[in-house]
Structures are given as C-alpha cells and as structure tokens.
Regions:
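Short hydrophobic core segments
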Residues: 8-10, 181-193, 332
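Helical element adjacent to the flavin cofactor pocket in flavoenzyme catalytic cores
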Residues: 132-180
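Helix-loop-beta segment of a Rossmann-like dinucleotide-binding subdomain
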Residues: 78-89, 106-152, 252-259, 312, ...
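C-terminal catalytic lobe of FAD-dependent flavoproteins
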Residues: 278-380
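Active-site substrate-recognition segment that forms the wall
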Residues: 21-22, 48-50, 78-83, 190-313
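N-terminal Rossmann-like FAD-binding beta1-loop-alpha1 element of flavoenzymes
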Residues: 5-30
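Glycine-rich FAD pyrophosphate-binding loop
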Residues: 24-43
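Dinucleotide-binding Rossmann-like beta1-alpha1 core, especially the glycine-rich loop
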Residues: 47-118, 122-126, 237-239
Length: 380
C-alpha cells in the first residue's frame, strides 16, 4: 500500500533538504534519495563559499536573501554556519571589470597583495574585493535542515532511487526503491539527474546540462594567513582559499558530463598545481584529497524553481549550477510559498499555511518569474 504525502521531494542534496525543512510542519512531506547517504554527490563537494557578487543578477538577489535567512538561523545553533571570508577577483583590468558586480569594489594592486601576500605581483594587474562574502559550514547546514525537517514530521528515506512516476487523479504515484508513494506535488530536486526524473515521470525534460568541477586539498610550504580571502582568477582558470593549514584549489573547469558519480581526471589537478606555483608563492607540495562534483545548469544559466508548464503538480527545483548553497534558503522559501499556495495541485488544509514560508518572495514576484520552469530561455 502506498504511503500518502502532500509533497514528495526527489533528491537529498541542499536543494531538497532546505525545501523539506521549509515545508515540514505546514504539510506532510517525504524526501527520497537514491544514495545511501544524503548530499552524496554535488552538495558534499561544494567550495563552501557564499559570494553575493557571483552569478547573474537574480542569483545575487537570492544569495543576499539566503545570507539573511542563514544569519537569522545562526543565532539558534551551537556554532555558526557562516564565517566572514572575503572574495577577491584578480586578473587584467578588462577581465576584472567584466566579472565584477555591484557587490564588489575595485582595490589597488598593493591592497590585493596585502590581503593575499602569496600572490606573485606580476601575476595580475587589477583586483576587486567582495567583503560581504562568507564561508559556509556545509555539513552543519545540511544536518540542521535534516533535523528541522524530521522534527517537524518529514520522512527522509535514503537508498530509494525513483524508478517510476505517473499522474494519479489529482496527484502523483511514485515508486522509489522498494517503496510506493502518493503525493499531491512531486518536487524534482534531483540535481544532475533532474532531467532523468522528468523522463521517468512522463514530463518533458528541460535540457539541463551537468558540468564537471574538480577541487583538491593541498599541502603547501607557506600556508595562507587566517584572514586570507578566497582568490579567483577573473578568466575562470582557478580559485584557491585557505582550508586550515592547507589550501583548497580548483581549476574551475567547465566540461560537460552526464549524470554520474564524478571523479577527478588525470592531469587536471597536476596542471593547476603547476599554474598556481607560477602565480603564487604557496609552494604546493602534496595533494591530500581531490574530488569532482557536478553543477547542473539550464540553457540560460539561471536556476529553475516552479511548476511545470504541462504537468500539474510537478515542481522543478533544479539547475542551480555553482550557486546551490548560496541560493538554497531563498529558493526553498520561494518554492515553499508556491507549493503551499496550491499552485499546480491543491494541498487541502495545508494550502493556507504557506504565506509565512513564502512571504518575502510572493509567487507572482519578479524573482519567481525569472526562475520559472515555463520561461522561454530555459530549454536547449
């Protein structure tokens, strides 16, 4: 016999977990995750930096709102999720100007070297600084969302890969692992697998494209000072930041991939180490660990949050690209407001409870329109 819920969320990464914690208590919620552990793929492989100056305008707006929501929650946690950590962009005058936004201020060459003495002076000619950027304790944030969701009555089921889904009356019938579910709303928060979930559900896919993003923790001869900013090349060729006594580095590659358990490819990190040892005095010695995540994007590079145009009760929460953590709380707030308002499928008694969850971002807002799954620019 199928278990019934108002909302069933497919995907246990930061998107699905943050939505589960936003919805639970206002309606009945289940979250199913294909892997045996939550946040296994992209969310556990994040750079853990929230950058208001990063991404398109709507992403920057979502980031500011996410930081507000996380800061409010920090006061209720035993340790903070957010830690101030500036973000510095370096490169040519032209490239820095092209990548900078209103959240970033230009700084002098000398000031950039003061902030990050490891930089070789001749390696860049211009720099910009975002002092509103924060480091993120991703494991703590994920755990808090799970605890809040479960405390409010949500059921979280791991090792339950969705293998079937179809419309049933006014809702959905979903098979995941050995379990059967019925739900008024099905939320597709499956990351790199979001298009596959759509196809399984008989819904037209959006043409979402996963891209590889590799990172590594390296041992260095000269560790970065404690207050060092995260440093990124304006030409998107690398970034690095302090990770305790070590340094986190990334080649910032944009290589298309299928949905998979991605792994570093031979040469990616080695080539980056050669480059960083030319533009910094870090003296990278050994690779302690390396990993590859998948960041999945829509054709226009903007995340997707909204009901499908043709499939009632099918809600897209996908395509976050490299902005997953920094937009997560704001996108969950928006999605909860739309779902609880009963768009696409009624939730009975729960439908009136969504006004507080989504008050800051009304479903008819400009932000909602920019993220809508019905927008013309989304499909490839």
């Amino acid at each position: 016999m199928a278990a019934h819920y108002d909302v069933l969320i497919v995907g246990g990464g930061i998107a699905g977990l943050s939505l589960a914690s936003a919805l639970a208590g206002s309606c009945s919620v289940a979250l199913v995750e294909a892997e045996q552990e939550l946040a296994y793929h992209t969310s556990s492989r994040s750079a853990r930096q929230l950058i208001p100056s990063y991404g398109p305008e709507v992403v920057q707006e979502l980031t500011v709102r996410t930081l507000e929501l996380m800061a409010a929650r920090d006061g209720q946690l035993p340790e903070p999720v957010l830690t101030p950590r500036s973000f510095m962009l370096i490169g040519s005058e032209e490239s820095v100007r092209a990548e900078a936004s209103g959240h970033m201020s230009p700084i002098t060459h000398d000031r950039a070297l003061e902030l990050c003495p490891a930089l070789v002076p001749g390696a860049f000619s211009a720099a910009g600084l975002d002092t509103g950027s924060f480091g993120c304790n991703a494991p703590l944030l994920l755990a808090d969302h799970r605890l809040r969701a479960e405390a409010a009555g949500a059921d979280i089921i791991t090792g339950a890969r969705v293998h079937s889904a179809q419309r049933l009356g006014s809702g959905w019938e979903i098979g995941a692992g050995q379990e059967a579910f019925e739900a008024g709303v099905m939320v597709n928060a499956a990351g790199a697998w979001a298009d596959e979930i759509a196809v399984i559900s008989g819904v037209e896919k959006l043409g979402l494209q996963p891209y590889r993003r590799t990172a590594a923790i390296v041992d260095v001869e000269r560790p970065l000072p404690e207050q060092s900013p995260m440093v990124a090349a304006a030409d998107n060729s690398f970034y690095f930041r302090r990770e305790g006594e070590y340094v986190l580095i990334s080649p910032v590659e944009t290589v298309p991939s299928g949905p998979e358990d991605a792994r570093p490819r031979p040469g990616d990190i080695e080539r980056l180490i050669v480059r960083l040892n030319q533009v910094t005095t870090l003296g990278i010695r050994d690779v302690r660990s390396a990993w590859t995540g998948l960041r999945t994007e829509a054709a226009d590079g903007v995340p997707v949050a909204g009901f499908d145009a043709e499939a009632p009760g099918f809600y897209w929460l996908a395509g976050q690209g490299g902005y997953g953590f920094q937009t997560s709380s704001a996108m969950a707030e928006l999605a909860a407001g739309q779902i609880l308002a009963g768009q696409g499928a009624g939730l009975g008694a729960g439908s009136g409870a969504g006004h507080s969850a989504g008050a800051a971002h009304h479903p008819a807002s400009r932000t909602a329109e920019a993220l809508a799954a019905t927008r013309w620019s989304i499909r490839r």
